[in-house]
Each structure stands twice: as structure tokens, then as C-alpha cells.
């Protein structure tokens, strides 16, 4: 991508969820971030001011709905409304991490489908396009009636491990049945077999038993997941793999939510290295030596340029 992009009608704005990533994306595209400010009234209400003309412009707003989830979501909705009222030609939301994605269906009676509600809010506010990364449930794309580009970080994560030459005895592991498609994509890139962690609870109030489907004895295992939240699943999976004879266990994910006891669990686990992306900004207290962070800015920057130029983005999905 060129160092400078000469279309004054292309604007990129950042809100507060991940300004560092937004700056990287703007640098990848070759433009400066747009000027805006986010302030608060004395009672906590959010006030947004766009400090330059965006009339007739194609605007891209970088905002993950990560912690604080509700604050970041309200910032985004208010920003969309401000852009709409300032006569932006298109309002494109770049949401590296889509919060509330784990509430994508009614698992029990009288539950909301909050992922659909969030989609409705974004559309109603005035967004004209979504660009996002590794949604927890890909079918959330169907909750939107506007175009949505659903990118994934499998290529980025696969390249990281491929460049480390971990040997011929690699196995890519899905920590549950829902992640098999993701694991298979990485396995195809690394030319490795896959294994699956099959979690079962024999009866109520009895601890889950982790069965491993596939051969991991004497193998180097790479666990891939979309989200690591409290890290319970992934650290228990790593322990089960080592007990089954794996020589080393690595882990990676697109979205490092890392809530509650996550850092302690990862530190004490047999995981050699945890590789994450910067879809979520990580404070210093969510950082340990065995972690490494990869940037999704080149991927998102390329997507922005292709969308703006009406070029195909299909190769970015692979």
C-alpha cells in the first residue's frame, strides 16, 4: 500500500476503544486520522464533536465494542448519528471486535438475542456498511441488511507459526466443536492434521471431562480460538493435551478479552506462547512474557482501500 492516499473524500475516524490500532490503520492507508473529540457531560453522558467537514465524504469509523462494552457501543452510535447529520456520503463501521456476539441465539427460554439488537442499533443509527473480524458466530452477518465484510485472522496467525518452523509433527487443535472450521483453515495452511477437544459433563454437578479426538502424542499442538475471555477452556485444553502426550502447546486467538482470572490461568498453564491480535487494546496489567501480539492493521487497511475503490475484497476472506 502506498504511503499517501490522495482522495480527500476518504476519511478515517477513531473513537476511544482502540486508538492505537486506528492510527496504524490510517498509516497503512496513507492518510491522517480525522479530527473529532469525545467528551462527557457532568452526569456521564457522551458528547461527540466532529472537528472538520465530512460533507459528501466516505467515512470509516474504527471502534471495537470491547470493555467497557456499553460505553464503546454508545460512543459508536452517537458518532454514527453525528456523521449522518453532517451529511457524510457513506458511514462505514470498522469493528475489529464485535461485542455481544456470544448472545446470538435463544439458548434458553426468555433470553434476548442481543447480537441482533446491536445490529439493529447500528443500522438504525445510520451505518451503511460494516467491516468486522472473526465474529464469534458468523451467522450474525445475516442480522444486518447492509453490506458486511467479515474478515478473519487465520492467515495472519498461520503465517506466524509457519515462520517459526515448529517441525513436521504439528497438530492444530480446536478447543470445542464450534471452532472446527477455524482450526481446519489453519491446518490447511500449515499442512497439518487437526484434533478436537470434546468436553462432556457425565452428569450434573460433575466436572467436565475433556476427551481428545485425534492423535496428539509426541506432537506440537496449536490451539486456535476466536475469543479468550476467562481462559478457562483454553488452559484446561492445554493441560489435557500435555497429559495426552503433546510435547508442546501453543495457543492463539483473534480477540484477547482476557477477563477476571485469565492472566493468572495463562501464566500458570502449560501454554508455551499465546499469540493474539490487537483487535482489542490491552492494558499493561493484561500482558505477560509468554504473550505476543500481531497487528490486524494491514488487513483492515487493505479492506478499507478496496471497499473505497469498489474493488473485490474476496481474497481477504481466505
UniProtKB/Swiss-Prot annotation:
ATP binds at residues 43-45, 102-103. It catalyses: D-ribose 5-phosphate + ATP = 5-phospho-alpha-D-ribose 1-diphosphate + AMP + H(+). The keyword GTP-binding does not apply. InterPro entries: PRib_PP_synth_CS (IPR000842), Pribosyltran_N (IPR029099), PRibTrfase_dom (IPR000836), PRTase-like (IPR029057), Rib-P_diPkinase (IPR005946), Rib-P_diPkinase_bac (IPR037515). Pathway: Metabolic intermediate biosynthesis; 5-phospho-alpha-D-ribose 1-diphosphate biosynthesis; 5-phospho-alpha-D-ribose 1-diphosphate from D-ribose 5-phosphate (route I): step 1/1. Its EC number is 2.7.6.1. Mg(2+) 1 binds at residue 136. This is Ribose-phosphate pyrophosphokinase.
